[in-house]
Amino acid sequence: MSAPSESIAAIEASAVRFREDFAKVRHEIAKAVVGHRAVVDGVLVGLFAGGHVLLEGVPGLGKTLLIRSLSEALHLRFSRIQFTPDLMPADVTGTTIVVETERGREFQFRRGPIFAQIVLADEINRATPKTQSALLEAMQERSVTVGGTTHELEKPFFVMATQNPIEQEGTYPLPEAQLDRFFFKLEVGYSSREELIEILDRTTTGKSPAIERVLDAASIVEHQKLVRQVHVPAEVQDFAVRLVMATHPQGPFATPMVNRFLRFGASPRAAQTIALAAKVQALLDGRSQASFDDVKGSVLPAMRHRCLMNFEAEAEGVDADEVLRNILETVPASAS
């Protein structure tokens, strides 16, 4: 079923401003972050789609700088939570305290750092599962319950978490069910020679320009609503569904590589993520409906953290990205 022509015209007109605002934020981030264009775009796709993003990379690659730069480019309240083994759930969500008032002693809720619009959860896998779940519950419900009282989180609410892939001692890896709550998992790689030279020029000579605020909360919420209005044709939707089902071992669309190397495949949230990311990409291209290529472009960041590899994959050095590329090569766009 296609969208009405009036709706198509309205979406395409709004797409112009969406594309301009996306480019403005990207430009401001680039003032501080050298390179990592795909990672920056992935973070912005997650923001405008209304999801949360997990960044993985070794220390010193600019993950925290990217997130700080984004908060500076947006007129949003920012907080950073450094996850450590001794961090308690109340340190994240807040706690109820007793205060002296004119009327005597009263209970008062003191808000934790989760009550911001952009939250950096730094080294999330260093905290205990109990503390991790406090953050992840807020991500899912967009609210915090303390002492039987529910406190709504302000819109937009965007969490970016970081984790280090090599320091495994003293860490608590996120369980699959909690990883599933992240819209994208983005891998931050090393900079090129030219990028490293540019980093040195900016950080050792005082050349780094100031980041300007180019977007506010109301504009972001408006863009998030626009994304939901983009049409996904039935055949494109079916392609996204078949890609997700192809990750299910022994399923009707599973490839031989999936059957060999995967223990569990992606959940329905993966299909939702792929569809929303495809809608964002369509808007960036000035279109009112998503295409097969839009779907293909979001498969890796949407599903790499939702596929659980088996022992044979670990022994053979096969990762989720390799299996997902095989699926993209094997599953045809058209079902016919």
Where are these regions (language model features)?
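Canonical AAA+ ATPase core
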Residues: 99-105, 127-131, 139-230, 279-281
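Walker A/P-loop
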Residues: 47-85
